[in-house]
C-alpha cells in the first residue's frame, strides 16, 4: 500500500456539486473500500472556487478523471479545478451505439468503450493518481458504469454496487434542471414531453451486472479480456481495500 497526501473529510455539502460522494466504506473482498481515496461526482464544471479549495485542501485531491466527450468539455468547460494544480485524465466514454434501454446502453459502454475503461482502471494504480474523482455530466450513467467496474474488481457485492448507483436518485431533480440547460447549450433536441423522466434504480444495475456475469464470468473476466493483468488488479485492491 502507498501513502497519500490524504487530509480530513469534506464536511457538509459542496456548493455547486449535487452528486459528489466518497466510494469509501463499501464492503469489499477482504475488508472495505478505503475512505478518502476514490470519489464520484457530477461534472466538476459546476464546482465553485470554494468547492475546489475544499477538494484540494481537505481531501488532498490529486487527479480528476473526466468521462465526458471532447465536445462536452469544449462547450461546458472543466471548472475551477482546471487551474488548481490537480492532474487531469481524459477518458471519454460517450458516443456508444444506441440501445433500447439503459441496461443495453451500459453493456454497450462496457463493450465499445472497454479499452478506455480498462486504461482508466490502470491509471488508478499509477503512483500519484489517488486521491481521485471521476465524473461525467450528471454523475449517473458513465460515472455509474466506471464505478461498477472498479467496485466489482474490488469485490464489492452486487447489491452494494447497485445501491451506490441508485443513490444518485436523490440528486436527480437538480440534475434534470441542469440537463435541460446543457441540452440547449450543446444544440441537442430537447426531451419530448411524452418521454418520462427516469430515475436510477438498483434493478437496472443488478441486471447490468448479471449480463456481465453471463458474458464475461464477472468483472474480473471483463478486465482480463480488456488487458488488465493480475498484478494490476492486485495493486488496485492493495490501494483501495482496507482490512475490516
Which positions does each model-derived feature cover?
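Cys-dependent protein tyrosine phosphatase-like superfamily
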Residues: 1-133, 145-244
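Ser/Thr-glycine-rich phosphate-binding loops at phosphate-binding pockets of nucleotides
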Residues: 138, 142-143
Amino acid at each position: 500500500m502507498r501513502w497519500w497526501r490524504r487530509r480530513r473529510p469534506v464536511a457538509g455539502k459542496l456548493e455547486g456539486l449535487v452528486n459528489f460522494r466518497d466510494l469509501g466504506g463499501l464492503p469489499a473482498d477482504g475488508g472495505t473500500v478505503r475512505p478518502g481515496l476514490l470519489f464520484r461526482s457530477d461534472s466538476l464544471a459546476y464546482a465553485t472556487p470554494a468547492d475546489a479549495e475544499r477538494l484540494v485542501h481537505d481531501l488532498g485531491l490529486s487527479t480528476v478523471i473526466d468521462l465526458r466527450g471532447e465536445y462536452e468539455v469544449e462547450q461546458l468547460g472543466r471548472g475551477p479545478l482546471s487551474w488548481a494544480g490537480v492532474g487531469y485524465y481524459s477518458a471519454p466514454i460517450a458516443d456508444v451505439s444506441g440501445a433500447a434501454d439503459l441496461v443495453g446502453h451500459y453493456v454497450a459502454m462496457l463493450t465499445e468503450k472497454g479499452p478506455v475503461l480498462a486504461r482508466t482502471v490502470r491509471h488508478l494504480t499509477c503512483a500519484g493518481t489517488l486521491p481521485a474523482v471521476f465524473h461525467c455530466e450528471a454523475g449517473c450513467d458513465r460515472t455509474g458504469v466506471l464505478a461498477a467496474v472498479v467496485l466489482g474488481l474490488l469485490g464489492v457485492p452486487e447489491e452494494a454496487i447497485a445501491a451506490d448507483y441508485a443513490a444518485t436518485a436523490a440528486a436527480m431533480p437538480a440534475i434534470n434542471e441542469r440537463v435541460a440547460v446543457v441540452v440547449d447549450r450543446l444544440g441537442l433536441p430537447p426531451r419530448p414531453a411524452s418521454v418520462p423522466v427516469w430515475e436510477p434504480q438498483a434493478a437496472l444495475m443488478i441486471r447490468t451486472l448479471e449480463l456481465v456475469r453471463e458474458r464475461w464470468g464477472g468483472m474480473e473476466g471483463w478486465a482480463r479480456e480488456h488487458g488488465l493483468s493480475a498484478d494490476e488488479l492486485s495493486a488496485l485492491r492493495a490501494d483501495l481495500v482496507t482490512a475490516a
